[in-house]
Amino acid sequence: MRNTTKLVVHVVDAQYLMPRDGQGSASPFVEVDFLNQLSKTRTVPKSLNPVWNQKLYFDYDQSVINQHNQHIEVSVYHERRPIPGRSFLGRVKISLCNIVYKDDQVYQRFTLEKKWLLSSVKGEIGLKFYISSSEEDQTFPLPSKPYTSPTQASASGTEEDTADSETEDSLKSFASAEEEDLADSVSECVEGKKSEEVKEPVQKLHRQEVFARPAPMQSIRLRSRENPHEAQKPMSRGANQLHPQNPNHLQSYGDTDLDDFKVKDMNLDLGERWPNPNAGERFTGTYDLVEQMFYLYVRVVKAKELPPGSITGGCDPYVEVKLGNYKGRTKIFDRKTTIPEWNQVFAFTKERIQSSVLEVFVKDKETLGRDDILGKVVFDLNEIPTRVPPNSPLAPQWYRLEDWRGEGKVVRGEIMLAVWMGTQADEAFPEAWHADSASVHGEGVFNIRSKVYVSPKLWYLRVNVIEAQDMIPSDRNRLPDVFVKASVGMQTLKTSICSIKTTNPLWKEDLVFVVAEPFEEQLVISVEDRVHTSKDEVIGKITLPMNVFEKRLDHRPVHSRWFNLDKYGTGVLEPDARRKEHKFSSRIHLRICLEGGYHVMDESTMYISDTRPTARQLWKQPVGMLEIGILGANGLVPMKLKDGRGSTNAYCVAKYGQKWVRTRTILDTLSPRWNEQYTWEVYDPCTVITLGVFDNSHLGSAQSGTADSRDARIGKVRIRLSTLEAHKIYTHSFPLLVLQPHGLKKTGDLQISVRFTTLSLANIIYNYGHPLLPKMHYLFPFTVNQVDGLRYQAMNIVSTRLGRAEPPLRKEVVEYMLDVDSHLWSMRRSKANFFRIMSLLSGYFLVGKWLEDVCNWRYPVTSVLVNVLFFILVMYPELILPTMFLYMFFIGLWNFRSRPRHPPHMDMKLSWAEAVGPDELDEEFDTFPTSRSQELVRLRYDRLRSVAGRIQTVVGDIAAQGERIQSLLSWRDPRATSLFILFCLAASVVLYAMPFKAIALASGLYYLRHPKFRSKLPSLPSNFFKRLPSSTDSLL
């Protein structure tokens, strides 16, 4: 069977190549090597900036390709003439993990690299590469000759395209009927000096026949299930408050065991209980980080030949599975169905099995009276087989129905069932109906299942507003004050008002938005006139769809475009009869693109879990695998009342990168056991995984709350991957802490197991020497205000999209996991940060105190040794740096014994949560803007003024010291400056005449002199410095 999937390498152009022909030029061609398949372009004679615009095709079979270990090698050569031969000009290696489909292709420029150490290489090459399986791209002529030499290969037949269809289509998608001429002119300008496109067949070195059809590339997309016209609701900037009904708050920690707030080692042997066929390979089994839990699975497939009901004569069949006191029912079919198919799975935990037999009843739903029993099937639990993956699924079988009275009489009808004993690793586990959730009905059944979510793919939309023409206001007697307003969904940004009142304003300002795939919103551009401080008049408006904007991966310039403005705001792609009424229209000049070289941050940089740019073409290879086993929780606090007692319906959410996971909800227990394991690819070890525990309030019952109820937060755990040792399993119990308006509260413990497996140590070391974020964040950074605003909008989009999944990951959960309120003011956080700085500086303070003790000869032996060491270092200064680094090396080895054994956790002392006052907590949980009384706000403002006054004094003292240094040579104090410059002259003569070692030795011995030779008065330099003037005298 012939493989129809092709890898297309579109060689566009090159720039600034190295001359090779001895006349300051070169005749370059490109050769591409992909898995021993060679193909080359034509030769462009006498050009250092050649343009090929040629496509090369290669067979692509994903079933035999390892994307992480194989590359495409693109080499540039100079063709020597008249003597056949070639000279190397540079090459580029492209990893297969960066390959995308044709719809996502983007033009990229690569810097040419050397092949050998002494090679002389410079220049760049422009390429597009993608995978295509369409018939249009497969129609190319077959080669008539095998690959021989560059001269012969360049003479092979090619097929020419009429135009660059991508650029043409993207431009014409903007243009309306009146703008076709403009689109054509812009298309010609974009093509520039590009030659006609050439499609070149593959010249194979080794021919292979592939009989297996290649598997398609896997991509995960979050599909929209919501009405696209529904408006997004912005996030509330206020802090979320949690008020459980039975709070046991920790007001004082004097009598509390502080060990309850520390990480505890569980010491569980998790991997030994699971069958592991790949024990000798690099990766272990799929479920080797959790405890094994056995379940009795019953799969009800379908039934046939069912008898009619005894009352109505018809049949509305359904199946009831009974095991002890647990009962589960399938959906009901109507009478029109002769062979009902349910295909439902029921799961009963082995720990709660209370019977030795399993009964499966087939019943007929009756409108009046009891349901009629058509028959049953009975299974002895001792005879049920056990099945654990990777064993194949158990095939269902047909069973004859027996009389439900137990007489052994066979009745009419058969039912197809599969019954087996399995574990949570079974494929049927996520979608099965669980016996412990029998009290959940309606939509609540879907809200308790475990699910995996994917964050939407976020882009930065950059709108560069350049200028506008013919801005005619409604009042022709005045010149307009013009500004531009751009909107995308709920995001709205404005440019400044043009500094000059004119009908042809100029701005050159950038407006940046956050948009998500699939693109649902449109960009609305309106030009408005500031008539009055409270009145703006729209001059023109235009609506543009997102999918027509150009995507760029670097800082290359994007082509700008003029757009006609419409008074009614009609888009350029939407013909409207009203547009024909106006023969004259204003115009605006815009440059719009989707930025793929940035990472769109939806979480704080301190807790970032993903640093990859938006464009998949720029992703690096993964450096490791992160495996998390969510075992369970212990000692959870009751979050609601049920039947007069406390109850908690807990589930756990984990977020790392773009992948979110949610465990199933365990009902009515304070010690839930999930035992679910998940895996993530790691692209940067300096990232953080976040796990949160919540109480489910959407179970479809009156006791569980209404649709407007919020899932209460129970606690959160963060783990930084760089703090974990590779290939080691960490099994710990982490305390869950929640800060509430009444104080800090421990809500339980989360038990998890973590393993970080490295794929390549060299790649991890490589990451430590490179920036955390993509290079565009440093070459063209956003301002601080832009970063905060864009992060807020990104969190809004992520919470909205995940809230539309089924079951939804609710807004309050996403906000808590992304720390939406981390930027709000808090006196507690300010104190915590201040003491963090003091703790950081405490080491320097200890060194200063130790040095003071040495100078005062408080410990004579130490002082003598320091003097001797100082003398040696002065006489042999080349030993200073080696001694310092060797000292740090031995300190690091010494500290290895006391290295941290546990991952970091939420520290209540570091967070300053153990001594915070109730008023400060109430202030932290206040909304933004405030919702407290005026008197309370006044008291807090006075307190903030007192704190700011102390900070103001410290900052003023620091500024005064710096100004005194500046005044040394400023002649603000003529006598002080005269003395200082005379001292500098004398010092220069002395330093020139005397050896440096003698001066350093004399200065050091003077500093370390005995207290007998010291005075308690300040030194002469200190007295002189404190007398210098500063700008404090000039302050009001």
UniProtKB/Swiss-Prot annotation:
Residues 146-155 have a biased composition (Polar residues). InterPro entries: C2_dom, C2_domain_sf, C2B_MCTP_PRT_plant, C2C_MCTP_PRT_plant, C2D_MCTP_PRT_plant, MCTP_C, QUIRKY-like. Ca(2+) 2 binds at residues 364, 366, 372. Coiled coil: none annotated. Expressed in the vascular tissues of roots and rosette leaves. Accumulates in roots meristems. Observed in flowers. Residues 158-168 have a biased composition (Acidic residues). Ca(2+) 1 binds at residues 316, 364, 366. Its cofactor is Ca(2+). Residues 1-110, 277-399, 440-563, 607-734 form the C2 domain. It is a multi-pass membrane protein. Signal peptide: none annotated. The chain crosses the membrane at residues 871-891, 979-999. Residues 190-204 have a biased composition (Basic and acidic residues). Disulfide bonds: none annotated. It is found in: Cell membrane. Keywords: Calcium, Cell membrane, Glycosyltransferase, Membrane, Metal-binding, Repeat, Transferase, Transmembrane, Transmembrane helix. Residues 137-204, 225-246 are annotated as: Disordered. GO terms for molecular function: glycosyltransferase activity; metal ion binding. Its main location: membrane. It comes from the Eukaryota. One of its GO terms (cellular component) is plasma membrane. May function as a signaling molecule by regulating the trafficking of other regulators. Belongs to the MCTP family. This is Multiple C2 domain and transmembrane region protein 2. It comes from Arabidopsis thaliana (Mouse-ear cress).
